[in-house]
C-alpha cells in the first residue's frame, strides 16, 4: 500500500492534512518530528509532508529535523512552518515579517507541477509571522502574495516543494488540487486507499491474529465500538463476545436499539448488563458534576470487569480505538498528553492473549464509511458524540429516575425534529439539557411549576471551538411546541446561543 508521511511539527492542522490526503485515496500517517530518519527510510514512503507549527525556526527549542531528510530522494512538501524549515535547513534566509499575514490572501503562482490546473490567481489561507527572504540555492520562487515575496518555492530536481500557506484548509480554494498534484504528479501515487480494500484486508488480518481464540469487546453503542464489533463479527463470528453495560443513562430506547442491531444483524455473543438501579443508588444525593462523572466511571468499569471475569477462555481484548486516539495518547516527544477514553487499561488480574484495535488506522469519517459498508444501521453509524457518563452530565444537580425520563422524552422529540428537517448530519451535535430549574407556567386554566429544558446545538470542524447552530425559528418553535405538549412535567424551552469558548459544548 502506498503511504505518505505527515511529519508533525506541532501544527494544529496535522490531522486535517492526513484526512485530505486520504480523501484523495492515498494512505497518510502522522508521526512526530522526533521519529528517527532510519525509521522513515525503512517505511518506503511515496512522499513526505512537513506540517505547519506555531514556532519560529530561529528558536533553538523549536522543532527541527536533520537536513539529511532533504537528500533521501523522497518528494517533500513543506507547509507554512514546514516551508520555512526547508528553507532554513537548505541554507536559505528566513526573517521575521514586518507585518504578519493572517486569513484569506490572493496568491499568484508561476508554472510548477504543484500548481497544474490551478488558476494563476487564487485565494489561499495564510497564518505566519516569519517569511522567506532568500530561497536556498537550487530553489525557484513559484508563488507570491502582495506582502509575501516567496509564498511558494520548489527544487524540481530534488522534488522538494514548499508553500507558505495552508492548502489543506477549505479557505484555500484550490488547495485540494495542489495536494492532488503533489500526490499524483510529483510522488507518482496511484490512489489505492479504498475502504472496501481495507475491510477485506483487515478481516484477513484479524482471522490470522485471532485464530481459534475468543475475543471480548466492550460495546458502548457509540460509533467506534459498534463498527469494531461489526468488523470483528465478520471476521470471527461467534468467537466474539460483546459486553454492553446499560447504566440507565442512555438516550430513549437506545439500549434496546443497540441490542436489537447486534443480536439480529451480526453473528456474535451479546451480553447486556442492566444495572440502572445500581447506578441510581450510587448517585443518590450527589450534585457535584465531577463527583457524578467519577462515580459513573468507577461503577461502569467495576460492572464491566466483573462481567469479563466471569467469561471463560477470554482470548483477546478488543477496543474501538481510532487513529486520532493513537495520536492524542502519545504525541510529541513520546509524552502522553492525555489518556483517551477509547484506550482502556486492563486490570492486572484479568489476562488476555493480546489487545486488538481493528480501527486504529482510521479517522472518524472512515470509520463511518466502514460501518455503512458492513450494514450497520445509519442511526448508529451517524450517532453523534455522546459523553461516557451519558445523560448524567446533561442533568444538572442530582440524578433521579424521574429526571432521566423527562430528559429522554424531550431529547427524543428534538432528535426526531432534527431528522425530519435534515439536520442530523448538518449539525455537529445537538441535545437537550435538564437544568436544575423549575419555572411557572400556565397549561389550560391551571398554574404549573415544572421543568425547564435547554436545547444545545453546535457547528464545528474539530470541537476545539464551536458556534451555536442557526436553526430556523420555525423549526425551533415546532420543537418547543412538541416538547411542552408531548412531554410530561416540562413547561418551558430555551435555546443556548453561546459559542465555545467561553462555554463548553456540554453543560457539565
Question: What do the predicted segments below correspond to?
Answer:
Residues 1-50, 54-72, 88-315, 330-508:
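RNA-binding accessory domains that recognize and position tRNA/RNA substrates
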Residues 78, 82, 87:
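Gly/Ala-rich beta-loop-alpha elbow adjacent to hydrolase catalytic centers
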Residues 318:
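Active-site regions of oxyanion-processing enzymes, predominantly non-cytosolic
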Amino acid at each position: 500500500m502506498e503511504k505518505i508521511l505527515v511529519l508533525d511539527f506541532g501544527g494544529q492542522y496535522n490531522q486535517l492534512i492526513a484526512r485530505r490526503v486520504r480523501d484523495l485515496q492515498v494512505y497518510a500517517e502522522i508521526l512526530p518530528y522526533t521519529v528517527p530518519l532510519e525509521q522513515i527510510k525503512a517505511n518506503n514512503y511515496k512522499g513526505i509532508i512537513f506540517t505547519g507549527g506555531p514556532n519560529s525556526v530561529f528558536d533553538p527549542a523549536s522543532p527541527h529535523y536533520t537536513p539529511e531528510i532533504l537528500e533521501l530522494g523522497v518528494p517533500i512538501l513543506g507547509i507554512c512552518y514546514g516551508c520555512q524549515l526547508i528553507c532554513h535547513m537548505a541554507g536559505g534566509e528566513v526573517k521575521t515579517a514586518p507585518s504578519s499575514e493572517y486569513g484569506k490572501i490572493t496568491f499568484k503562482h508561476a508554472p510548477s507541477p504543484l500548481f497544474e490546473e490551478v488558476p494563476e490567481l487564487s485565494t489561499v489561507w495564510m497564518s505566519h509571522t516569519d517569511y522567506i527572504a532568500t530561497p536556498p540555492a537550487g530553489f525557484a520562487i513559484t508563488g507570491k502574495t502582495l506582502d509575501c515575496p516567496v509564498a511558494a518555492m520548489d527544487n524540481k530536481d530534488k522534488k522538494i516543494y514548499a508553500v507558505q500557506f495552508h492548502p489543506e484548509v477549505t479557505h484555500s480554494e484550490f488547495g485540494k488540487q495542489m495536494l492532488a498534484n503533489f500526490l499524483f504528479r510529483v510522488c507518482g501515487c496511484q490512489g489505492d486507499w479504498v475502504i472496501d480494500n481495507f475491510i477485506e484486508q483487515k478481516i484477513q488480518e484479524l482471522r490470522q491474529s485471532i485464530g481459534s481464540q475468543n475475543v471480548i469487546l466492550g460495546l458502548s453503542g457509540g460509533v467506534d465500538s459498534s463498527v469494531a464489533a461489526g468488523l470483528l463479527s465478520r471476521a470471527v463470528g461467534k468467537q466474539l463476545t460483546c459486553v454492553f453495560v446499560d447504566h440507565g443513562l442512555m438516550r430513549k430506547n437506545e439500549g434496546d436499539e443497540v441490542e436489537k442491531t447486534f443480536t439480529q444483524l451480526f453473528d456474535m455473543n451479546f451480553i447486556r448488563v442492566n444495572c440502572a438501579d445500581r447506578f441510581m443508588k450510587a448517585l443518590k444525593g450527589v450534585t457535584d458534576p465531577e463527583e457524578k462523572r467519577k462515580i459513573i466511571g468507577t461503577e461502569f468499569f467495576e460492572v464491566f470487569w466483573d462481567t469479563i471475569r466471569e467469561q471463560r477462555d477470554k482470548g483477546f481484548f478488543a477496543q474501538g480505538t481510532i487513529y486520532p486516539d493513537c495520536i492524542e495518547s502519545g504525541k510529541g516527544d513520546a509524552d502522553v498528553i492525555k489518556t483517551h477514553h477509547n484506550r482502556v487499561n486492563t486490570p492486572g488480574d484479568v489476562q488476555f492473549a493480546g489487545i486488538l484495535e481493528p480501527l486504529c488506522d482510521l479517522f472518524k469519517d472512515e470509520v463511518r464509511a466502514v460501518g455503512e459498508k458492513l450494514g450497520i444501521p445509519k442511526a448508529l453509524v451517524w450517532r453523534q458524540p455522546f459523553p461516557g457518563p451519558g445523560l448524567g452530565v446533561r442533568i444538572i444537580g442530582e440524578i433521579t429516575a424521574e429526571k432521566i425520563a423527562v430528559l429522554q422524552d424531550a431529547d427524543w422529540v428534538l432528535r426526531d425534529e432534527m431528522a425530519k428537517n435534515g439536520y442530523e448530519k448538518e449539525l455537529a451535535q445537538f441535545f437537550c439539557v435538564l437544568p436544575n430549574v423549575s419555572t411557572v407556567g400556565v397549561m389550560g386554566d391551571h398554574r404549573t411549576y415544572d421543568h425547564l429544558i435547554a436545547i444545545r446545538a453546535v457547528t464545528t470542524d474539530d470541537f476545539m471551538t464551536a458556534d451555536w447552530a442557526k436553526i430556523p425559528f420555525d423549526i425551533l418553535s415546532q420543537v418547543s411546541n412538541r416538547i411542552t405538549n408531548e412531554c410530561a412535567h416540562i413547561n418551558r424551552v430555551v435555546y443556548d446561543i453561546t459559542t465555545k469558548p467561553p462555554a463548553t459544548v456540554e453543560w457539565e
